Amino acid sequence: MSTNNEAIFNPGKGAGESVGVAILGLGTVGTEVLRLLGEKAEDFERRIGGPIEVKGVAVRDKSKPRPGIDPELITDDAFSLVERDDVDLVVEVIGGIDYPRRVVLAALRAGKSVVTANKALVAAHGAELSEAADSSGADLFFEAAVAAAIPIVGPLRRSLAGDTVNKVVGIVNGTTNFILDAMDSTGADYDEMLAEATRLGYAEADPTADVEGHDAA
């Protein structure tokens, strides 16, 4: 089943069996995902019926210092990681389009369910990814890629199933929302708040997709 953004991930395992997770990308988002998987381990186990075990983290540069992270988990071979037998769920937070597309397709075709926060990837290749998920029986979760990860896709599908939505109005990019709100409330200028958004990790090192509207589109 693909594009499943309404149900909790079901790994299809018996009660108490562990769920193997692979994380692709260890920037601001990936690092936070890894932290939360450890900090909220008991909550996740209670929700899915078994413990979560991080099996590996794929990065572009293995030589970069990563304090507090087991070096045995780090790999620069994302393709081998997502195809491992002990990996059930892949979390993609790499960014970009072409490379993550190839890795996510490899994961889905190997029967691994995927969670992605990559809105550019979903916008450009969502249909292809959904087809791959359908073919293998894997799940593709993309709620994290929509409207700054607020839970909106599931409610729109369920609660408004009988309605016709003519348009949606709002500032749907989190970085832009932060910048505009701060400019309005503090009187700071745009460049100052863009720099602050980057420092806080809200904006990427290259914020073009955020501030020029590509992510929102």
PLM segments and residue spans:
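Glycine-enriched alpha-helix->loop->beta-strand junction motifs that scaffold or abut catalytic
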Residues: 111-113, 174
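Short, active-site-adjacent cap segments at secondary-structure transitions
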Residues: 64-65, 122, 178
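General beta-strand structural signal in soluble alpha/beta enzymes
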Residues: 74-76, 83, 91-92, 115-117, ...
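Core active-site phosphate/anionic-ligand binding loop and the adjoining beta-turn-alpha structural block
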Residues: 134, 139-217
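N-terminal glycine-/serine-/threonine-rich beta1-alpha1-beta2 phosphate-ribose binding loop
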Residues: 2-110
